């Protein structure tokens, strides 16, 4: 279905409910530059570090795209997707069933869920929705939950310390969204809905947060404008 969530005035706080879940795949493909390409890049990198029965957990797994694609490319993995949206989990389960892949999707708060024993943990555009006071605690939990040779993949929207550059990058992103078919009204509505809900960090703040949690090797494997993907090794 086509994303039309923000083509009408906002009447409630943004949440990942049934209305959003029903169009979320289209929303991601049109709102996140190079979304499919980035996910495929992460999978192609990650599969080289994985062995049979390794546990991989996707935090904020939404409709399950990442784990389903990983399952199609590499078999015999213990794949778990966690999301606190029941509507997202329902769609993820239906998609996994349709593709005939084995992935466990759990409706839970990953801040409370036991992540221990994971070879890899993935969070694509998820951490940015965690309140800053809880964010460092989550990253430390991820580090502690990984095996000694574990990997954390994190994609985030970014801000820059230079205010003029930040405005330029935001304008470039809004131009991209217009090219993808969103109206200025829809863009403005979504910006208002996500204000104080999605709280991005700078590149350096994200790297420092990963270092403070204990990660020693951190690389940026993808970047477009104000979007980036980090890989961190325990």
UniProtKB/Swiss-Prot annotation:
Domain of life: Bacteria
Gene Ontology biological process terms in this record: tRNA wobble uridine modification
Keywords: S-adenosyl-L-methionine, Transferase
Annotated catalysed reactions: prephenate + S-adenosyl-L-methionine = carboxy-S-adenosyl-L-methionine + 3-phenylpyruvate + H2O
Molecular-function GO terms, alphabetical: carboxyl- or carbamoyltransferase activity; S-adenosyl-L-methionine binding
Transmembrane segments: none
Subunit record text: Homodimer.
UniProt cross-references to PANTHER family, sorted A to Z: CARBOXY-S-ADENOSYL-L-METHIONINE SYNTHASE, TRANS-ACONITATE 2-METHYLTRANSFERASE-RELATED
Record-stated family: Belongs to the class I-like SAM-binding methyltransferase superfamily. Cx-SAM synthase family.
Annotated protein name in UniProt: Carboxy-S-adenosyl-L-methionine synthase
Source organism (scientific name): Nautilia profundicola (strain ATCC BAA-1463 / DSM 18972 / AmH)
Gene field: cmoA
